[in-house]
Structures are given as structure tokens and as C-alpha cells.
Amino acid sequence: IGGKVWYVEGDERARKLTYKDDLKLLNIEPPSSDIFCGNGFDVHAFCEGDYLNLAGVKVPFNKAFKAHSDGDVAIHALCDAILGAAGAPDIGQLFPDTDMKFKGIDSKILLERSVEFVRSIGFEIINVDITIICEKPKISPYKDEMAKTIASVMGINRFRVNIITKLFEKSVVRPAFSVIER
């Protein structure tokens, strides 16, 4: 390398770490590997309207979701997943539809409050993965805007938010298990 080399006498107290087992000499606790994962699910019936609120984005459609809030099924499921991972009550308990202060509320506010709550009790949200099962309207053109909206509300990097869209594809479970159906 071009520099001078010196010989330095070692000291018994200066432990050298050569092998993986030598790390035991440091006597430190390993980092926690506790990762908590939540799962959320939500459905709403349709009513008269001209758009659906999905993941914080107004998607043009010939109907709307019937709900006490704005009916955003994606955000409601996400809130339940976040709260569930922390062992907290679900959004129905924290933001009940019997409380008029939540009538017509923007679901992004519910998400913001859910995130604030889990952070206040010591949790960190690493990433979110949202699956929207929907025949119509077509959701794919809105996925990036949805991910940006969710990331902004949650205060996390956009690339830590994943939006997946799925179809039933004429599955036999469709009549018994519908999330969004025309």
C-alpha cells in the first residue's frame, strides 16, 4: 500500500475477533429479532355514487361504498393489520360507527391515528403490503398513486408500501367470498 508497517505488542485485555465464536467474548445481547405481522380484511356493500375510495385515492366508478366513514376498504384493512400486529383493538373498537364524530371521516385520518397509536407504544412500521381483490373498476392504473398516498400518510418511504391487485378470475369462491364485486 506504500505506507510503513509497525509492530505493536498485544495486550491480554484487547481481545481479537477473528472467528464468529469470538463475538461471545464481547458479552453483548444480540439485536431483537421480534417482528410482528398483522393481517387486515374489510368489505363494504355498494350504494349510489360515482367513485370508490381505495387506499386514499378516489377511483371513478358507477357506485360508492356504503359506510359510516368514507368506506375505504383498503385503508380499513391496513389499519386493522397495523393495530393487530401491535396487539391493539381493531378500528371498529377505536373508531366505532356508533360515534358520530367518525361519520363521513376520511379514512386517511383513521390510518394516521392508527399509526400514531402503535408508534406511541413503541412499535415501528417497516413496510406494508395491501392486496385489493376487485373485478371492476380496474385498479392497476391507480396503484402508484395509492402507494404514494399511503406512504405519505404513514410517514414511511414510498418503496415500503406495496399495492397488489387481484381478480377472482371466475373462481368458484367468488359468490361466497366477495371483496369488491359489481
Regions from the PLM with identified roles:
Residues 171-182:
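C-terminal edge-of-domain segments
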Residues 81-124, 135:
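Glycine- and Gly-Pro-enriched alpha-helical subdomains that act as flexible
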Residues 70-82:
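Short alpha-helix carrying the canonical HExxH Zn2+-binding catalytic motif
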Residues 59-69, 97-102, 168-170:
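A short glycine/serine-rich beta->alpha loop
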Residues 1-35:
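Conserved alpha/beta core of the MobA/IspD/sugar-nucleotide pyrophosphorylase nucleotidyltransferase superfamily
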